[in-house]
Design a protein with these regions (language model features):
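Flexible mid-to-C-terminal extensions adjoining Fe-S/redox cofactors in radical SAM and related proteins
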Residues: 1-7, 27, 267, 274, ...
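Conserved alpha-helical substructure of the radical SAM core
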Residues: 1-121, 132-145, 149, 158
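Short, cysteine/histidine-rich loop/knuckle motifs that typically chelate Zn2+
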Residues: 23, 261, 325
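Conserved C-terminal portion of the radical SAM core fold
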Residues: 8, 12, 55-68, 88-95, ...
Length: 333
């Protein structure tokens, strides 16, 4: 019997992204074809009903946020407007993670309409230079001005609201502080993009300054602590966190005993559920290929799956395999 309650939910409803960011496995392997599917609205509602009815039992009574991002672009979901109706119906909120290419005027109208069901919007735009952006995300350079105009239009419309949606632009990148030798958590490999890593004058700092010129009133930050979730990017010689794990984590013990990788709710193994477009429950978003599936929300109730022996066994198996390559793992004896 699992004594924990579900405190966080990640629900991927389409399994597809139109971007190929250099720091994401999608750029090298593509989205797993087994889970590229628009989840029907009735299946989404089924999950929301189970979560709602389970509050106070196997679900935390305060659960209100259902994340809609995995390795997908949520704005590509064909029934996005109707999906947001379901979020409102069951009093759930979500954060929108988008590359902004799909942040069209029509999508902006939908987001504004569903303002009360949206906690915030996070823009993943790694470069302010059209050619560099195209290289970093694997999209046609001609889409760059469209993407910039999409953001400007959203800001304009959002500012008309009495209580605007919080929107933040995150510049994912690398600088010297990212590296293990400097106290960081990664090391670049031979296939990584060539970048100036200087903290004060390098590429990441320049990107931040240029974005502030383009969007002077927008919340903007750089994110130099990138993650190679379970060593996927190491496979393609992009980056590795192996030396950092050896340096910072393994001295604490001989094996993985827990997880510290969740947003807000820390333990993805004990307090999160991750659901792919097929309704499969898997251990963590680090499991890019869905190798840790332990149940299905439509074949067995969420409560049964949450309390199942299969789930316990998969957590324990993950601690000996997938989690050993993760920088969020907790090591002990």
């Amino acid at each position: 019997m699992n004594s924990y309650q579900i405190k966080a939910v990640q629900l991927d409803v389409n399994g597809i992204c139109n971007s190929s960011c250099w720091f994401c496995p999608v750029a090298y392997a593509g989205n797993p074809k087994s889970a590229i599917r628009d989840m029907p609205l009735e299946e989404i509602e089924n999950i929301f009903i189970q979560l709602t009815n389970g509050k106070g039992d196997f679900v935390d009574p305060d659960l209100s946020l259902v994340y809609s991002a995995n390795y997908n672009e949520i704005l590509l979901y064909k029934e996005f407007d109707s999906m947001m109706d379901l979020y409102a119906k069951y009093n759930f909120k979500t954060n929108i993670l988008t590359n902004a290419v799909n942040l069209t005027k029509s999508k902006t109208e939908i987001l504004i309409k569903h303002r009360n069901s949206i906690q915030g919007i996070l823009l993943n735009v790694p470069s302010s230079n059209p050619e560099t952006w195209s290289k970093y995300v694997g999209m046609n350079v001609k889409l760059f001005p469209k993407m910039i105009n999409n953001i400007k239009y959203f800001i304009e419309e959002n500012n008309k609201l009495e209580n605007p949606i919080f929107i933040h632009l995150m510049i994912n990148g690398i600088n010297e502080l990212s590296l293990t030798k400097n106290g960081g958590w990664l090391d670049l490999l031979q296939n990584a993009p060539k970048m100036d890593l200087k903290v004060q004058t390098g590429d990441l700092k320049k990107e931040h300054d240029r974005f502030k010129e383009i969007f002077p009133d927008l919340s903007i930050s750089t994110a130099h602590h990138l993650y190679d979730r379970a060593a996927h990017l190491e496979t393609y010689n992009i980056m590795t966190q192996g030396p950092a794990i050896e340096k910072y984590l393994k001295p604490n013990g001989s094996r993985v005993v827990g997880c510290n990788g969740g947003l807000g709710v820390r333990s993805r193994t004990n307090e999160w559920i991750h659901i792919n477009p097929n309704g499969d429950l898997f251990i963590c978003c680090a499991d890019f290929d869905f190798e840790t599936i332990y149940g299905n929300a439509f074949k067995t109730s969420l409560k049964e799956v949450w309390h199942s022996r299969a789930r316990v066994d998969m957590v324990n198996e993950s601690y000996t395999k997938m989690c050993t390559d993760c920088s969020a793992a907790i090591w002990g004896n």
